Design a protein with these regions (language model features):
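Short, Lys/Arg-enriched N-terminal segments with co-localized hydrophobic residues
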Residues: 10-28
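Intrinsic disorder/low-complexity segments
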Residues: 9, 14-15, 215, 299
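Membrane-embedded helix-loop-helix hairpins and adjacent transmembrane boundary segments
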Residues: 26-490
């Protein structure tokens, strides 16, 4: 009886929390030093966000008054791209499926170099607040509003929905509290500094968070890799299929994670926030290589986890469990803070971008074209709350939040990729009719195929959406009465 009481008391304390998902009584080994590092870090992020508060104008709040320098731009691009969802997802996916991440990393490098060479400078010269604004400048307000709606939902799924799960997992492991309570605590912290600071605060917290992120991931990879016996220990212990490429899985992963980068609203908002076009371009090119190196490290950790952890561990908990189990005191706190840094930097950025879609692409474009600057800031802040709380709500209520993210990215990319890229780079005639029909048709086909699990030639639904969108766009535009040459700069 006394032992039962003692066990109950242990479960209620931080340092005696039990990992129920393993169904084993293994204690979390977070020391006082680890806790001090984590708490100081979390409070510091709120403090940095508050200190850099800027909401004097919409340009201040949404794009940092277009004054971000090279170092801050590079750090915020990296911290956002290699977010908690990307890290935990990459580690977990490698743990489950082996080297399937390799083609994705290569394609991401190519896409990031393309964005740096051909997109970043052009977007900064054009200027704006959101990616769907490019649709509005070329095809008209209805296309911008529809694109803004698609983009806002995509931002909600990628940011608060996915990242609240990652942060909730961390807090659950550390505190032993219910995971949903952890998700609520984490989202409250992120909302606090995002609402108060806007892009300046988000970018500066990203700057600090990237330092933690890079250092923590590097340390964690080195120690976990060594613990697994190095590459020879990994290759001799993991199942043979983990070292064989699943082509179908790789294609699906590339389509789901790489194609959205081409029209990612969060990425475009960074271009608009740079102090000049050269800064936007160089920071994007610089960020491309370390992003891929961080993803390679996550791949190594995932393979090492196959050696070090049980085979039935949920993939979303693999990264955090590695940190808790195999790192020494102090370094453990640093690396957990790094994981939280990755999560928070992605969540805040995507919330701000989604909120800007609401205020710029929907509210000002469709509801109140005469909105004042002050009204725009207020609507953007309300949008941050809406995107954050809706994303958290989806994560709390739905059994599979990944489905929400997949559907939103499928609709956004399937419908908007072709008209947006042609609007930016195409020199021929452009048509409102062709663009709108292709956006609706491509998005609808992609959604229908995804919901009904329709697979042709092993390709994911997003590819069907892009193909249908392209056929409609280039099939209708030459014959549309409203087709004309449009300068995107106007």
């Amino acid at each position: 009886m006394s032992s039962d009481i003692l066990n109950a008391v242990k479960r209620s304390t931080v340092f005696g929390c039990y990992r129920n998902y393993w169904q084993r009584k293994e204690k979390c080994m977070a020391s006082v030093l680890d806790w001090a590092l984590i708490i100081i870090y979390m409070l510091s992020m709120v403090g940095v966000g508050m200190y850099f508060k800027t909401d004097d104008s919409m340009q201040d709040f949404a794009v940092a008054d277009k004054k971000l320098g090279l170092s801050v731009m590079t750090a915020t691009m990296l911290a956002t791209a290699v977010g908690g969802g990307a890290l935990t997802g990459s580690v977990g996916n490698s743990y489950m499926n082996g080297i399937v991440e390799v083609p994705k990393i290569i394609i991401l490098l190519c896409i990031n170099l393309f964005m740096g060479l051909f997109v970043a400078k052009k977007m900064r010269n054009i200027g704006g607040f959101t990616a769907p604004e490019m649709l509005g400048r070329v095809y008209g307000k209805k296309c911008q509003t529809l694109g803004g709606l698609f983009c806002a939902i995509y931002m909600m799924g990628t940011g608060p929905a996915m990242q609240s799960i990652a942060l909730g997992t961390c807090i659950h492991l550390l505190l032993g509290v219910n995971m949903k309570v952890g998700m609520i605590i984490g989202m409250a912290i992120i909302l606090a500094y995002t609402l108060s600071s806007g892009m300046w605060g988000v970018a500066m917290t990203d700057y600090v968070q990237f330092i933690f992120l890079a250092g923590g991931v590097l340390l964690a990879t080195a120690m976990v890799y060594s613990g697994a016996g190095g590459w020879s220990g990994i290759t001799s212990s993991v199942p043979a299929e983990h070292l064989q490429l699943d082509t179908s899985g790789a294609i699906k992963l590339i389509c789901a994670t790489s194609l959205p980068v081409l029209i990612d609203g969060n990425r475009y908002s960074r271009f608009f926030s740079a102090k000049d076009a050269k800064t936007a371009q160089i920071s994007t090119l610089i960020a491309a290589v370390p992003q891929c190196l961080l993803l390679v490290m996550s791949l190594v950790m995932g393979l090492a986890a196959v050696v070090l952890l049980p085979a039935d561990l949920p993939k979303d908990m693999v990264f955090a469990t590695l940190l808790m189990q195999y790192l020494p005191t102090g370094i453990k706190g640093l690396c957990i803070a790094a994981l939280m840094a990755a999560i928070m930097s992605t969540a805040d950025s995507y919330m701000l971008s989604g909120a800007t879609n609401i205020s710029v692409d929907i509210y000002k474009t469709y509801i109140n074209p005469k909105a004042t600057d002050k009204q725009m800031v207020i609507v953007t802040k309300v949008g941050i709350l809406a995107v954050g709380l809706l994303g958290l709500g989806f994560a709390l209520l739905l059994p599979d939040v990944m489905s929400v993210w997949t559907l939103s990215s499928t609709a956004y990319v399937g419908g908007c990729l072709v008209p947006m890229l042609y609007g930016i780079f195409g020199s021929g005639k452009k048509s409102y009719t062709g663009a709108l029909i292709s956006m609706i048709g491509g998005g609808a086909v992609a959604l229908i195929c995804d919901l009904n699990k329709i697979v042709i030639f092993g390709l994911p639904a997003i590819v069907y959406g892009i193909i249908v969108s392209a056929v409609l766009f280039f099939g209708i535009t030459p014959f549309a009465k409203d087709a004309k040459i449009v300068d995107i700069r106007k």
